[in-house]
Amino acid sequence: MNLNRRSLLKLSAASVAVGSIGLPSFAQQIEELVIAYNVNLPSWDPTVGPSAVNPTIQGLYQSVFDQYILQQPDLSPAPGLLTEWGWSEDKKQVWMTVREGVTWHDGSPFTAEDVAWSLARVAKPETGSPIQFVWGTLANHRVEGKKVIADVAQFDPTIFKWMYFLTGYVLPKVYYEKVGAEGFE
């Protein structure tokens, strides 16, 4: 058989057409979502251990957990779980207003208590947060309505920037206390 250019093009077009005809799918249906990722996830707690500061894993964590403050593509902050934040005039306290109408995975409401607890938890050295030294600059976290107030133990002008960077995630207090750290492994 001698193929000229025109015959080769016709044969190629016919092959593409035959290949595009719908064939039955042999894939099995499953009851779970499977995501392939190029690194292992050692923990589902995005605030502790080496994985908390691994930039490769942050995409996974951001798919599951919300951060205090969001970061826009131009790197500017935007409201996230916190709608407003700032400093007292004397810079001895920070305040944060918590978004309303948010629920956790189990349907329970997201509260200012979750924010205060999450910030206080990662400030403790025993939690294993790799950047505990940042969160430890705030102390005496308390809730006043939908606001969280914290005292500034050591002034860090970048504290709000950390809330949209590594380990800047809020965890559900009630759920965490129910399942413990083991529930996030």
Protein language model regions, located:
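N-terminal secretory signal peptides and thylakoid transit peptides that target proteins
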Residues: M1-S15
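Surface-exposed binding/hinge segments that line
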Residues: Q132-E185
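Extracytoplasmic
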Residues: I30-E32, S63, G80-L82, K91, ...
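Extracytoplasmic/secreted proteins, especially bacterial periplasmic and envelope-associated proteins
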Residues: S63, G80, F110, D114-W117, ...
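N-terminal lobe/hinge region of extracytoplasmic solute-binding protein
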Residues: A36-E89, A120
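Aromatic- and charge-enriched surface segment that lines or borders ligand/interaction sites
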Residues: E84-G128, E144, I149
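C-terminal segment of N-terminal export signals and the immediately downstream linker at the start
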Residues: G22-N40
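Solvent-exposed loop/turn segments at secondary-structure junctions
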Residues: N40-S43, G101-T103, F155-T158
